[in-house]
């Protein structure tokens, strides 16, 4: 039987990220099409080579075709039929999808139905799925949802204290995101500790950021809510605020509610306080960004304390992942120091270079603390393989 390659696709409103794997789950190539609809930029990495070029992408369709042509042009594949499986990251599956799913007429219709819950994400994701269904007719397509891991959150944790019809008629509730990352971290540590199920507090800290309480291997609670805007202070997102601010600013500045929410998503967070959304720049200049760093660290620490309480103080590890959690040692140290009274201990000597994971807690620490490099693309590959194999059976 011919061994098929597996493509992982992450489509956004103005960008598409790709990773191509062989049947041994090894990365063959990484691609990026960004600034779609504007001026266009393309990047491809393979065999220790890197191609970067400006390309006009008028829509997602042209971006997909350019990437697939680049794979053939650079002899990464000979024919498109070599790609037998495509895993699509889909942000919003609501509480309907409790697992990854083979894309068919029904599942695609549901993804489109949930565009109203995540218009910036589900629409381009649905569009790109349809493009691949046409471009590579022989491939199976699997949708892997950010929200799936959080469908185990109990009702008392996902329900908002709002009128009942908001949930019943408009699907307003906590969904949570970064689920693929949390699933990867949980499974990685199950293997590392040779123990399952685990209790974990995982901080996924990147430009977007959230915290998740995992109880017995399942999501118990998470800081992001109905949208990724809730929770931690992020690169450009405000995180938790008083909701009455939205109508107040709309009235005061003669803006629509959508305009205000757009500013909370794209012009707030660390960007609003420091003028930069790049966490590396911010934490490299602590003397200039002192207030912003304190706000950021305090918010993460508050969620760690909250979730430790919800887990009755019984956890196998506190985990830091995502671009900031994996690499910004100064930031992680500050957060751990902020929760030292709860029994978490570290020191700067433990923050060296590492590959997949690194223990950063001291012997005196009540709890283990790890940094773990997440791999959402590999998790999507594994979910896609599992779902497509089950279909064959």
Swiss-Prot record:
Broad enzyme group: transferase
Keyword Cytoplasm appears in the UniProt entry: yes
Annotated ATP binding sites: 17, 204-208, 278-280, 323-327
GO molecular function: acetate kinase activity; ATP binding; magnesium ion binding
Pfam families: Acetate_kinase
Assembly and binders: Homodimer.
Name the UniProt record assigns to this protein: Acetate kinase
Source species: Mycoplasma genitalium (strain ATCC 33530 / DSM 19775 / NCTC 10195 / G37)
């Amino acid at each position: 039987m011919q061994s098929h390659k597996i493509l992982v696709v992450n489509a956004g409103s103005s960008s598409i990220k790709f990773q191509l794997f062989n049947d041994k789950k090894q990365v063959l190539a990484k691609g990026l099409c960004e600034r779609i609809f504007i001026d266009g930029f393309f990047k491809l990495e393979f065999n220790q080579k890197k191609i970067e070029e400006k390309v006009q992408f008028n829509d997602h369709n042209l971006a997909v075709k350019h990437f697939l042509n680049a794979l053939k042009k650079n002899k990464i594949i000979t024919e498109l039929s070599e790609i037998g499986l495509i895993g699509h990251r889909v942000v919003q599956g609501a509480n309907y999808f409790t697992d990854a799913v083979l894309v068919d007429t029904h599942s695609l219709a549901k993804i489109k139905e949930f565009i109203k819950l995540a218009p910036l994400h589900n629409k381009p994701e649905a569009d790109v799925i349809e493009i691949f269904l046409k471009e590579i007719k022989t491939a199976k397509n699997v949708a892997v949802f950010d929200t799936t891991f959080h469908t185990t959150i109990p009702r008392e944790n996902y329900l908002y204290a709002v009128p009942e019809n908001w949930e019943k008629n408009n699907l307003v509730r906590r969904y949570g995101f970064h689920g693929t990352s949390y699933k990867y971290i949980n499974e990685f540590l199950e293997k590392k500790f040779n123990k399952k199920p685990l209790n974990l507090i995982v901080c996924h800290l990147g430009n977007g950021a959230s915290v998740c309480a995992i109880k017995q291997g399942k999501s118990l609670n998470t800081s992001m809510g109905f949208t990724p805007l809730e929770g931690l202070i992020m690169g450009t997102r405000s995180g938790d605020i008083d909701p009455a601010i939205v109508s107040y600013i709309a009235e005061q500045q003669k803006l629509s509610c959508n305009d205000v929410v757009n500013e909370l998503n794209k012009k707030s967070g660390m960007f609003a306080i420091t003028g930069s959304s790049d966490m590396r720049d911010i934490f490299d200049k602590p003397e200039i960004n002192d207030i912003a760093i304190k706000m950021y660290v305090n918010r993460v620490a508050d969620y760690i304390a909250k979730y430790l309480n919800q887990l009755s103080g019984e956890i196998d590890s506190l985990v830091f992942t995502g671009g900031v959690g994996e690499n910004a040692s100064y930031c992680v140290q500050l957060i751990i120091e902020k929760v030292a009274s709860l029994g978490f201990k570290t020191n700067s000597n433990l923050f060296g270079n590492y590959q997949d994971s690194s223990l950063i807690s001291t012997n005196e620490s009540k709890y283990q603390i790890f940094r773990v490099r997440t791999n959402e693309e590999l998790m999507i590959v594994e979910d896609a393989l599992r779902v497509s194999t089950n279909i064959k059976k």
